[in-house]
């Protein structure tokens, strides 16, 4: 880490305005957060009460706290009882989807996002101790790289020129959750009665379909191999006239010439006869194509990064894919060879005349969903929240997305009204200055809105509250067991 001298700190390098940091506005970030919340307050009104003040307090807690952002600890920063916050997050009937829809409307209205945006589909798993949490089960946890007791969410992120955020999400419920034996557990944990089993790919398509019916503009849909290898999903995207660049595994089979798919002549007329590939040409795995002598690689500069420039080798060619007797589809096979020599593959429905630079751009968008996941978890506290019931999971998602959008909108506004001093880059000897990160902006908010310090009286009240709750819990357990208190 660089150590700065006193003389350096007095130079332009440490001048806040040179970095686009408006000192006066930093001091009023709390007011800015309040005004942001006011736009969403109606989303938290129910038929019986207005719970919007809980939303403001919870949002503030997510942004200002750094660890252990659970319901009880956030409640303490709000000056509320944990029970009231628990009720707001778990049982109150406000709609998380209504909040997410308003976020997307505001993202769509942002002039900076008029073109060049990408939707990115991904999943993220969190470890769970047992199946007592909605959606939990032994399933693949990508972070751990193994099958483990986990709760998995599918998420849709929006990315644009260095900005990224979740804009939608769905909780994946494994198929065994829909068995008759789990009916009571589904009801206990608030799973909607009309919820049916859906694969992660189907949940992903539901979100894409939902967002594409709104006004949010984007130029490409990207996804990892879990979703990209789905012929069904790629077909759905094409039918909806949405451009995609979908990562696929190295063993994905494609044809270099259009195959003939039909019912074999000798089987025509039979009721159960199914179409199949009749061509003599055999399919090839995409990793075989990358090694062909006719495959030409060219270096493409995709974008500037904080580490320099993303310049990798790319190659692309037209191929055909088919599955289960469906008519073949012509797609781009996009291949990227990174700096370590590893080759990554994607299929895209970009037009046949699309230049390699455009294909390379689409191939390199998926990394931003990892940035969105990191910000949601590390900065906003998604992985610290412990939603046991279905409504709590949806409510947590809505408030985490609100927090991320508030930070992103603040950065966008400052970037537009308080740009970097061009002399600063020259003084530092670089051609590009780093933008504010979500972590940077949150640090400023935490300074402008410091958490309340715990007094002796406050700590005493918390201890008594804890003891009272333990006493009531024991009383409840004894009542459940049918015991009676002894007279002494």
Regions found by a protein language model. Give the residues of each.
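Conserved, well-structured functional cores that handle cations and Mg-NTP chemistry
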Residues: 9-222, 226-253, 260, 264-282, ...
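Catalytic-loop motifs flanking and including active-site residues across diverse enzymes
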Residues: 152, 368, 372, 395-401
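An anionic, glycine-rich sequence signature occurring as long contiguous blocks
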Residues: 162-193, 249, 254-368, 450, ...
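Short, well-ordered loop/turn and helix-capping segments at boundaries between secondary-structure elements
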Residues: 352, 365, 369, 374, ...
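Conserved nucleotidyltransferase catalytic core and NTase-mimicking acidic/glycine-rich helix/loop elements
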Residues: 404-443
């Amino acid at each position: 880490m660089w150590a700065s001298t006193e003389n350096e700190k007095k130079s332009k390098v440490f001048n806040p305005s040179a970095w686009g940091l408006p000192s006066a506005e930093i001091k009023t970030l709390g007011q800015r957060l309040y005004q942001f919340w006011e736009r969403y307050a109606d989303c938290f009104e129910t038929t019986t009460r207005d719970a919007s003040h809980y939303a403001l307090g919870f949002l503030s807690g997510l942004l200002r706290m750094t660890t252990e952002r659970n319901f009880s600890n956030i409640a303490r920063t709000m000056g509320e009882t944990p029970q009231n916050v628990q009720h707001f997050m778990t049982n109150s009937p406000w709609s998380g989807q209504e909040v997410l829809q308003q976020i997307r409307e505001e993202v769509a209205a942002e002039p900076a996002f008029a073109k060049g945006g990408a939707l990115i589909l991904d999943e993220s798993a969190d470890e769970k101790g047992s199946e007592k949490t909605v959606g939990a089960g032994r399933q693949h946890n990508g972070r751990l790289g193994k099958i483990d007791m986990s709760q998995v969410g599918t998420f849709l992120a929006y990315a644009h020129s260095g900005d990224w955020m979740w804009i939608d999400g769905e909780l994946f419920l494994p198929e065994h959750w829909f068995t008759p034996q789990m009916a009571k557990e589904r009801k206990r944990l608030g799973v909607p009665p009309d919820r049916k089993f859906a694969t992660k790919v189907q949940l992903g398509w539901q979100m894409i379909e939902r967002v594409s019916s709104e006004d949010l503009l984007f130029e490409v849909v990207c996804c990892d191999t879990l979703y990209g290898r789905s012929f069904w999903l790629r077909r759905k995207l094409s039918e909806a006239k949405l451009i995609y660049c979908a990562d696929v595994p190295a063993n994905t089979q494609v044809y270099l010439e259009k195959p003939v798919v039909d019912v074999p002549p000798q089987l025509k007329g039979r009721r159960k006869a199914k179409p199949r590939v009749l061509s003599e040409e055999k399919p090839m795995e995409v990793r075989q194509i990358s090694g062909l002598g006719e495959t030409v690689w060219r270096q493409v500069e995709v974008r500037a990064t904080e580490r320099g420039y993303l310049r990798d080798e790319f190659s692309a060619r037209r191929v055909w894919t088919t599955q289960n007797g469906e008519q073949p589809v012509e797609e781009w096979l996009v291949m990227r060879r990174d700096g370590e020599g590893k080759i990554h593959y994607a299929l895209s429905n970009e037009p046949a005349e699309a230049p390699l630079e455009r294909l390379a751009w689409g191939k390199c968008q998926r990394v931003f969903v990892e940035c969105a996941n990191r910000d949601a978890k590390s900065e906003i506290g998604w992985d610290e929240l412990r939603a046991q019931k279905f409504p709590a999971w949806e409510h947590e998602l809505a408030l985490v997305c609100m927090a991320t959008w508030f930070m992103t909108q603040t950065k966008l506004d400052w970037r537009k009204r308080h740009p970097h001093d061009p002399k600063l880059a020259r003084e530092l000897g670089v051609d590009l200055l780093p933008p504010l990160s979500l972590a940077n902006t949150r640090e400023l908010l935490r300074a402008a809105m410091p958490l309340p310090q715990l007094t002796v009286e406050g700590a005493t009240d918390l201890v008594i509250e804890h003891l009272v709750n333990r006493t009531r819990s024991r009383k409840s357990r004894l009542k459940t067991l049918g015991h009676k208190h002894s007279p002494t």
